[in-house]
């Protein structure tokens, strides 16, 4: 059984696709999770959530209240398509508008943390100008988040600009704002040439949540747990010993699998077994 001090959540894209959040949260509860992380990616379908009506937003809040399963975080990867670092003024403006809408949405439905994708640009070539635009966009975004009391948290990425906690800390120091923090992915962190334990310790005062997935060098998605390079037990031990008490989120993309729930149960049991070995939870 999970300790009450260690919330364990599941990524929306691990569960069957669809727009009924009551069903999704009920399933997450059945599978033993404390929360679900919402995805707002670059697809028109998920981007349209930011334009939900008052009634649609209220339906999500009611589903949270009815099930007791929270939606405390949003993975905002839409900036791949509309990057804050774009050299196109119109694209940058659209990226900031997405950020504004995401912050307003979070404020309305009770989302506390918006995980940001650490790309200055994704589909274009990066340069000094794209990085400058990215910094400026982050500064404006954090000002909006501060007014709304919503935390923006940078993910450690599959991309050189933000592939370590050390690099993300540079942005945290530059912005110098309590509403900008870090949301590391231990899979992405492990896939690069990082001293993972040192990196986790360095970021501990800024880490608000942790993504849990396996990876291989150059392969950042859909690596089955146990088949990659991540030393989960050591990562969990380091975080525990460093005083981290926040949430862990199992990140998977099994929504199109033949039986998503079965895939999730398998991953949940595997992760909880490593948590138990690290002394974080009771052994099953």
UniProtKB/Swiss-Prot annotation:
Keyword Isomerase on entry: yes
User: What Enzyme Commission number(s) does the record list for this chain?
Assistant: 5.1.3.22
Taxonomic source organism: Shigella boydii serotype 18 (strain CDC 3083-94 / BS512)
Pathway it works in? Cofactor degradation; L-ascorbate degradation; D-xylulose 5-phosphate from L-ascorbate: step 3/4
Q: What does this protein do?
A: Catalyzes the isomerization of L-xylulose-5-phosphate to L-ribulose-5-phosphate. Is involved in the anaerobic L-ascorbate utilization.
Q: What is this protein called?
A: L-ribulose-5-phosphate 3-epimerase UlaE
Induction field = Induced by L-ascorbate. Repressed by UlaR.
In terms of domain of life, where is this protein from? Bacteria
